[in-house]
């Protein structure tokens, strides 16, 4: 990358995988690794500026000197970089490896069959390993899938800790018996909306007080729900022209004239009406919640012009202009 300059790389030809494993200094020293965390962050941000390289960063649960809280801190530090994929794995204790040789010292228990993944350590009890596995599943479904990109950006304004958010979402799945079931994409959206409603509509718990931002505490919960409903609709059409629509979706016939005027590619395009304008692709982190527009906004999703990196449709915003009528931006 240094030789050719990442801006010269052809889009979607390179995938960069960075094995972070942990940001906990004691852990990094114990596994005999050297890492300059701030330098790592600089490199990742430099790569991201050009938006042409798919970057994967990984973390490993079950390493020495890593307990639940320090792992959560590692998770949040790496999540803040918003890589294309944040891969959360579990320590594998392979025969002859350093971890195998020190398993007794670290009080590591692990599966006796492949892939020999950790069950507990001196620092991480079995119960915490199970909780991290729930976080991993929620991360895969709602972040790594790329199917909820805009909604994840909005939730980043509401939650201080992404780890806490995925942890609480996992608890919500467990309470309602949602784990172990096959859920369609729209059902995943419904569950996420249910979770947000439960979190922000009632009294905020002590844990939520610590992990929810001031914006999340002060914002009207109905406004939050309106934004999330629209961001979930945006996410659905960002990837595909959905045949089915969630129950809260607006009636398509309301803007059928706009659809006729702008949808020139049949099923390869779609127009949706929004009250909020959502961030452009290059804006990985939102600083504030989207603001309600004074007039209806229309997003034109063009599936003939997809981003080769994430396969999302090209989006053109269409706004009402007093003099010119509808105009695209």
Regions inferred by a protein language model and the residue ranges of each:
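Single conserved hydrophobic/aromatic residue that forms the stacking wall/gate
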Residues: 1-5, 10
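C-terminal catalytic core of tyrosine-transesterase DNA break-rejoin enzymes
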Residues: 27
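Generic structural motif
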Residues: 1, 23, 304-306
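Conserved C-terminal portion of the radical SAM core fold
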Residues: 11-22, 34-159, 175
